[in-house]
Amino acid sequence: MDKVAEIWGTVPQYGQWALAGIGALYVATRVGAFLQLLLNAFILSGTNLRKYGKKGTWAVITGASDGLGKEFAQQLASKGFNLVLVSRTQSKLDVLARELELRWDGFKAKTFAMDFSKDDDSDYERLAELIKGLDIGILINNVGQSHSIPVPFLQTDRDELQNIVTINCLGTLKTTKVVAPILAQRKKGLILTMGSFAGVMPTPYLATYSGSKAFLQHWSSALSAELKDQGVDVHLVVSYLVTTAMSKIRRTSLLIPNPKQFVRAALGKVGLNSSEPFPNTYTPWWSHAVFKWVVENTVGAYSYFTLRLNKNMHIDIRNRALRKAAREAKKQ
């Protein structure tokens, strides 16, 4: 401390004032960002979805038959939107569509079964034909795949690697290429794409999934600037763990909401992006947002410390998954 004081004493007074001012400004911006985060999480409401269309306007949802996609369908239907439900299994889509038709008077649904991992251009052509003439106001890019368990990149199954990139990246881009022209033509629309903490913080043992979500982060932010002047709002929705089949987590906690809680927040906080480092990105669930802010403003999302911590955590998850699989194999 004496050495620091000695060095500080050699700085001219105007320099001391300048350095103190810079430090105070930095602290003020950090405090302001955190206060904005709290306002976004607990007080402010996002853009009213009626901006994107009156009752009976259509929304397109990918990965619609399970988890977050199914919950997006249920909540958008409750808000008066008709739905184009896109997922792999026709029977699940039929059940969901029928359930929503019975629950909401006047509700309409169209279903389209496609396997995004096939990357079949004819599927996208048929999807374009299905939605032709519909007044579409919202696109939810929810379809996605992760690794079955955390796995070293060099041990990743080739099909799993390809499916993750094809579904998460190409599936999202090609669906958006089909739907976005309709939104741009009507001069108003919303595109929500599901992101992940794995796209914000490089995640060892989920390297391919992490990279695919980082790709979506930059693509979505870039697209938001391109479509803004055409009246289309584009946002990336960042999530941590949610109790879904993909996460394999069943119990909720302070840091882990269920799909209903998360989707309610996602639809209720659209456009509240000011506390995020990336343009047109938001973390709707409050504890996710606080956790993310703390990491980014202390150790850093890209720091060696965070990378090492993430690696050790996923090694532990992998080991537990392998032990569980071994126990189940012995029972057979």
Swiss-Prot record:
| Bridged cysteine pairs (disulfide) | none
- Cellular component per GO, a single term: endoplasmic reticulum
Q: Which residues bind NADP(+)?
A: V60, D115, D123, N142, K177, Y209, K213, V242, T244
Membrane topology qualifier: Single-pass membrane protein
Per the UniProt entry, what are the Gene Ontology biological process annotations, in alphabetical order?
fatty acid elongation; sphingolipid biosynthetic process; very long-chain fatty acid biosynthetic process
Q: Where in the cell is it found?
A: Endoplasmic reticulum membrane
Q: What is its EC number?
A: 1.1.1.330
Give the main EC class.
Answer: oxidoreductase
- Under the GO molecular function aspect, what terms does this record hold? ketoreductase activity; very-long-chain 3-oxoacyl-CoA reductase activity
**Spans traversing the lipid bilayer:** 15-35
Q: In which pathway does it act?
A: Lipid metabolism; fatty acid biosynthesis
The reaction(s) this protein catalyses: a very-long-chain (3R)-3-hydroxyacyl-CoA + NADP(+) = a very-long-chain 3-oxoacyl-CoA + NADPH + H(+)
* Keyword field: Endoplasmic reticulum, Fatty acid biosynthesis, Fatty acid metabolism, Lipid biosynthesis, Lipid metabolism, Membrane, NADP, Oxidoreductase, Transmembrane, Transmembrane helix
Q: Which domain of life is it from?
A: Eukaryota
Q: Which InterPro entries match?
A: 3_ketoreductase_fungal, NAD(P)-bd_dom_sf, Sc_DH/Rdtase_CS, SDR_fam
Q: Which HAMAP family match?
A: 3_ketoreductase
Q: Which family does it belong to?
A: Belongs to the short-chain dehydrogenases/reductases (SDR) family.
What is the protein named?
Answer: Very-long-chain 3-oxoacyl-CoA reductase
Organism (species): Neurospora crassa (strain ATCC 24698 / 74-OR23-1A / CBS 708.71 / DSM 1257 / FGSC 987)
* Lineage, opening ranks: Eukaryota, Fungi, Dikarya, Ascomycota, Pezizomycotina
